[in-house]
Amino acid sequence: MRTVSDYFGSLVFDDRVMRAKLPSHVYDSLKKTIDEGASLDAHVADAVATAMRDWAVEHGATHFTHWFQPLTGITAEKHESFISPSPDGGVIMEFSGKELIQGEPDASSFPSGGLRATFEARGYTAWDPTSYAFIKGHTLCIPTAFCSYSGEALDKKTPLLRSMQALNKQALRVLKLFGNEDVKCVHPCVGPVSYTHLTL
């Protein structure tokens, strides 16, 4: 009989899975992106996408989606298939770093708060590596931010991420004024116990 500890988080591509599935240099680079906001190299993104796809397929996933929270108050998803036809009549499973990092849904059906004209319908979903991907049913759900072509926030997550970046920047400035030069990043957290995590 399976215990709760056996299946708790088993469908989440969390730190334990990343550490097990990714080469050490890829894992270290991704952790630097997550913890310090460092830019993500295209080769690292491809390696992460391959590991994420293989893990998802092992758990029965056939599709992936960029999962985001537009201004409608509910979540939205754009589903794509891992499956591509092969020349010999079979199928191959594909998922690239480019597909992981960015999607381009039609933004015309989502509210914009008057930020742009209706004909400026292009919107982008951008992978948020600070939130773990997870499997729901047969779909790998990739948490993303949703922005307009010119960078305006079209969702509820982008303002939160930008606020966290601003808080990190100012908190680091204050800490360095007090002589603490070792802190690289400040992570605000909200929960039963509110605290701020410092990355040294």
Regions found by a protein language model. Give the residues of each.
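Divalent-metal coordination cores built from histidine and acidic residues
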Residues: 1-5, 193
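Histidine/acidic residue-rich metal-binding segments in metalloenzymes
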Residues: 4, 8-11, 16-97, 102-117
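Structural beta-strand/beta-sheet cores of well-ordered domains, especially the beta-sheet scaffolds
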Residues: 36-38, 90-91, 125, 138-144, ...
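Flexible, glycine/charged-enriched surface loops at secondary-structure junctions
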Residues: 41-43, 179-189
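Conserved structured core elements
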Residues: 46, 58, 161, 165-169, ...
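Buried hydrophobic positions in well-ordered alpha/beta secondary-structure cores of metabolic enzymes
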Residues: 64, 192-193
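Charge-rich interaction surfaces and accessory domains that mediate macromolecular binding and assembly
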Residues: 115-182
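Conserved small/polar residues in nucleotide/adenosyl-binding loops
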Residues: 196-199
